[in-house]
Amino acid sequence: MGRYSGDPVRNHALRHSARNGSSGTRLYIGTPDEPPSEALLNCVRELSRRSLVISAAYAFNMAVGDNLPSLSIGLYFDTKPNLREVEELFRQFGRNIRPLISDINFVDLLPLDPSNLLGVAVRAQIKPFYRRVVQ
């Protein structure tokens, strides 16, 4: 949904399983060897806390087909989110995380929900770095 210049990811081998997407393309998801900076994770945590529609956030490497893996931040929604709402949230996230990542690398910001394969796969394989606490 959004790509922002970001922290370096040097992991070229993913440790988790591959899945076939609906088009037959292999999708590889894994834990980064070098996690994103704590400043970046804290920024995403704080922004996620402010949004009632985000229930969890995940940092993972993802590769599609034969492409090299890239760092992704997945924001998990309990239900399929409204596109306008996601676009506004991602603009806000982009403005806030851009200063925390270098100019030569990038971070993919992705919406995750129970209705898409990526959301199901990430939730099954990656531990969230943020989880909404309901009181």
Question: Where are the language model's segments positioned?
Answer:
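A contiguous, surface-oriented mixed alpha/beta subdomain in the mid-to-C-terminal portion of proteins
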Residues: G2-Q125, Y130, Q135
